[in-house]
Regions:
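Glycine-rich phosphate-binding loops that contact phosphosugars or nucleotide phosphates
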Residues: 4-124, 130-137
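A short, charged, Gly/Pro-tolerant segment at domain boundaries
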Residues: 139-157
Length: 157
């Protein structure tokens, strides 16, 4: 529901979670132009500071407890943006700020950062969100997917 009724969806993450946020953006941009990914944490903070109640922050963070992440989520929360957090920990500082918390990932220690098992769970959540988005917005997503597929197929030799 949040992803469909929005002006912008920012896909954010830091460190290894940024790669997952970029994957989410790459998947959604084929069907929904309102999805954006900002890689730099300073730029993420600025976008959050200008967010509106019509925006959604889709934040990926295994721990849900990093300073940079909270520096993004606090202003977004103050400005009324919806926050969807994808994390491993239900009881984390970020989960306390989120409108929706999606739990995923296998257990990993600090020396296992970015394990394949944890990433597989995150990719599965992205796939479920994307497929549900397309299912609930068929007219828009089918036309956009055809247009983006055409743009990419033109690049094939």
């Amino acid at each position: 529901k949040y992803l469909s009724a929005t002006q912008r969806v920012y896909c954010f993450g830091q460190g290894g979670s940024l790669v997952i946020a970029m994957e989410a953006w790459a998947r959604f941009i084929t069907a929904a132009p309102q999805f954006q990914c900002i890689e730099d944490s300073h730029m993420q903070a600025m976008a959050a500071a200008l967010s509106t109640p019509d925006d959604v922050i889709l934040f990926f963070s295994y721990s849900g407890a990093t300073k940079d992440m909270l520096d993004v989520l606090r202003p977004a929360r103050r400005r009324g943006a919806k926050i969807i957090l994808v994390t491993h920990f239900a009881k984390s500082p970020a989960a306390a700020m989120a409108d929706v918390t999606l739990l995923c990932g296998s257990k990993e220690g600090p020396l296992q950062s970015g394990s394949v098992a944890a990433k597989m769970g995150l990719l599965f959540i992205i796939d479920v969100l994307f497929n549900e988005y397309c299912r609930t917005n068929p007219a828009l997503t089918e036309a956009n997917r055809e247009a983006t597929a055409g743009a990419i197929s033109a690049k094939l030799l």
